[in-house]
């Protein structure tokens, strides 16, 4: 027929008993849908009922009409305004030349009428089931995203868009890349359903606004996007970056970007005037670097950066609340681009230190690290602690950031700058200004922000040497991706409950600790990051806090971040989402696999920030520094085979190795050399750098053919092929794969939605999603899965391509 109605994927034919999420392989949902159906404060039940009616009527006609046609020819609704419309075949010959007799016609007519009544009854039940599913506790954010993506009906899409308001912010935030990618690349009905929620959240949170603006810019940058779709994403981005989405009270408080005299300003206005000064930090910094640059290429890049900055600011007219942060991010990105032009690691390190020392002159400011999970202001960047990371062609670098936590970023005043010399003369807490995290306390302490831009004494050499930068890993002990090492060092408190330990256990543990103190790495000019990364995080925090003028404050936090330029982190963000989903699945199914997803901030199509994994160094650095095998290094770090520390580290190694082997198999992760596999202080391995996943491989050679990387050194740490821990490893692999395939749809939809309109290399080829689904082996029995795991483990352990690739990396990049 003409415009055939395509039913949403979740809806089943009339013969099936339940509506479920698309691709759902589970059992009936009706037994639980009838229980605990909650009322939704945001959803209008009449609107929902009408939307479901529209969808299900069309589904009924589509399914029922085809079923009633014996000849399989297209059907047409003659009276297309309702359920009782006449259905006929488009290809029927004229009445005058029909060969059927009257009796046959009567029989067909009678059957059609009865079929229509049955279909009305069935679809009425379906309609009730679908609405009850939407309103039930089973309807989580994952199911909502699936229906939003698969449904072709504007009514259902609008309903789901309204339903987003009922989910927790953090649950929706996880799927923000999918929502914005659908907005940019799918039809207008989907965009219209999503936009109200995005606008509402942007009014509530400046950090959410920044995340949306960055992602919209990145996802709109693909060359194949049509002019109409590109302009749609750009229009929403401009709206987010404008004053239109500011809450009304903030519009009244925040001044314009034009300079204003200090006289007559209220304390809050003085604070925002300071923020305006901060917003020009990178412009001032760029001009200073031009005057001192000795490299003509660097000078040219600075001019391009300045021109680009002016163009962006003029184009989007950034409000005060986002302008300082955008300039702060641009400054960090510009540093990375300039470092990439220098030939040696030593020159890059020196340049990085000098660049950050200049940046420090604009702090504290109304800026934050977007990778953090709490409100805060950046106060210092310890430039001498920054290091350049290993990279052949680019210059990613790691910085540490000192921040002060606050209750609300928008309403809390920017902290006053505390000069270093004042701290040294009056070190006691009693003589320092109190600076709590409450709004009232902070308003009293920081109501007036002095301008130290021209104060030479305030910015002495000693001051610059102690600075630090913020990060998201140390704040909370919740189940986010923030590093627990940071949490332990900053927020933990000694338990007041008495703990009784046998004296013999105390003596034994003390002797083990004294005999097996973790080793320190030697400084290597070719790899300066090794020493910084090997230092225990708690020691680093203590050392930096003691030397900081802000360290006495109870809301002081230390964070860290990796800044990358020239790399597209959209694939990294996709991998992070899949890892988080698998981590949640294994926790839900109580499978003791261990993986550590780390946060990714996509800034543009070729730049971003990464949350570092603290207390961890690469296996390459371990082997280069220690000149030991992996097993011998474990014995050196954790003690002999029978010690509690070694057994705990060995178990951690097995659980993390099994987890990442499954990740590498499902996502087809490549480029698995020892520089991309970390080993932390507790024995876990952590895979990093997911630049080659799914359909992409280094240089598109497809050289690594094994399911995952499992070397003989890994097996030795597990106790050998006949060891109990090796059998435990294979058992975890099987349990993890069984658990993952139970929730395959949750994993696949993350990847499938991001493929829409994407030019990422991981989506090259038409079979990416089909191959991903096949790796879950839905048709296999558990016995067949066990055999498959045995074959994958054996093949990976004996893979000649893994050994050849490690040798290739050693010869070309020196990676051991």
Curated annotation (Swiss-Prot):
Its EC number is 2.7.1.67. Residues 49-242 form the PIK helical domain. PROSITE patterns: PI3_4_KINASE_1 (PS00915), PI3_4_KINASE_2 (PS00916), PI3_4_KINASE_3 (PS50290), PIK_HELICAL (PS51545). It is found in: Endomembrane system; Mitochondrion outer membrane; Rough endoplasmic reticulum membrane; Golgi apparatus. GO terms for cellular component: Golgi membrane; mitochondrial outer membrane; rough endoplasmic reticulum membrane. Interacts with ARF1 and ARF3 in the Golgi complex, but not with ARF4, ARF5 or ARF6. Interacts with NCS1/FREQ in a calcium-independent manner. Interacts with CALN1/CABP8 and CALN2/CABP7; in a calcium-dependent manner; this interaction competes with NCS1/FREQ binding. Interacts with ACBD3. Interacts with ARMH3, YWHAB, YWHAE, YWHAG, YWHAH, YWHAQ, YWHAZ and SFN. Interacts with GGA2 (via VHS domain); the interaction is important for PI4KB location at the Golgi apparatus membrane. Interacts with ATG9A. This is Phosphatidylinositol 4-kinase beta. The gene is PI4KB.
